[in-house]
Amino acid sequence: MDKIIKSIAQSGAFRAYVLDSTETVALAQEKHNTLSSSTVALGRTLIANQILAANQKGDSKITVKVIGDSSFGHIISVADTKGHVKGYIQNTGVDIKKTATGEVLVGPFMGNGHFVTIIDYGTGNPYTSTTPLITGEIGEDFAYYLTESEQTPSAIGLNVLLDENDKVKVAGGFMVQVLPGASEEEIARYEKRLQEMPAISHLLASKNHVDALLEAIYGDEPYKRLSEEPLSFQCDCSRERFEAALMTLPKADLQAMIDEDKGAEIVCQFCGTKYQFNESDMEALINDKA
């Protein structure tokens, strides 16, 4: 089961989130049938949103949009504070050449664009922030958002590793944040450790990558595990929700669907689930509108 571990240095100077998101990204790949580069780009966005959602309280909903002008198109993810995330990538078929070590490239092909976050607290006034894509690697773009919009200096690492068949092998990441009151000496020590950390892809390839990430972040520094919470890919779509959407259409449009297509098929963008509405269903909707 996927999980996020929240921890804090015993000194109180830093906190870290470490994630195993393997099943989340694997299920997203399965539902959207994504090729290698699309899988990694979508996976990184899902992991970034899992981190962002874990930082919120209450029943907030968090939307992350990675909008680039490349062949990926846009990437949309929605998460809640209970560990659930869903998402899709506009172009599922991007399969760009890999590096000599087999890593999938994303950043050089993302193009120009923006990292957009929308945090809905349920009050009717969602908070929206837009920052430019800095590298297109998504992790660095997320870190830039946290620094610029939330005024919280953060180190982010996230990635998706694929096997020889381009299926998800492991996915995960981390976030380290400076907390108020950290001394310059403590900050310098952590900056040095982060600079010396092995690449995120190397740590994810470890036998137990969650422990490997924590060890790389803290080293000999004492720390406390604050919580361990489950994560999952879960879509909240339903037939009732799409039925309500159809009810917003004019009766003439519903009748046209009956006449031309003998009903309607609606496919959820986030999970690919198909909902069929036959002629009888459509006629019932028209009668309900009458």
UniProtKB/Swiss-Prot annotation:
One of its GO terms (biological process) is protein refolding. Gene3D superfamilies: Hsp33 domain (3.55.30.10), HSP33 redox switch-like (3.90.1280.10). Pfam families: HSP33. The keyword Chaperone applies. GO terms for cellular component: cytoplasm. It is found in: Cytoplasm. Under oxidizing conditions two disulfide bonds are formed involving the reactive cysteines. Under reducing conditions zinc is bound to the reactive cysteines and the protein is inactive. The keyword Protein transport does not apply. Disulfide bonds join C235-C237, C268-C271. Its main location: cytoplasm. NCBIfam families: PRK00114.1. CDD domains: Hsp33. The gene is hslO. Belongs to the HSP33 family. This is 33 kDa chaperonin. Redox regulated molecular chaperone. Protects both thermally unfolding and oxidatively damaged proteins from irreversible aggregation. Plays an important role in the bacterial defense system toward oxidative stress. Keywords: Chaperone, Cytoplasm, Disulfide bond, Redox-active center, Stress response, Zinc. HAMAP family: HslO. GO terms for molecular function: protein folding chaperone; unfolded protein binding.
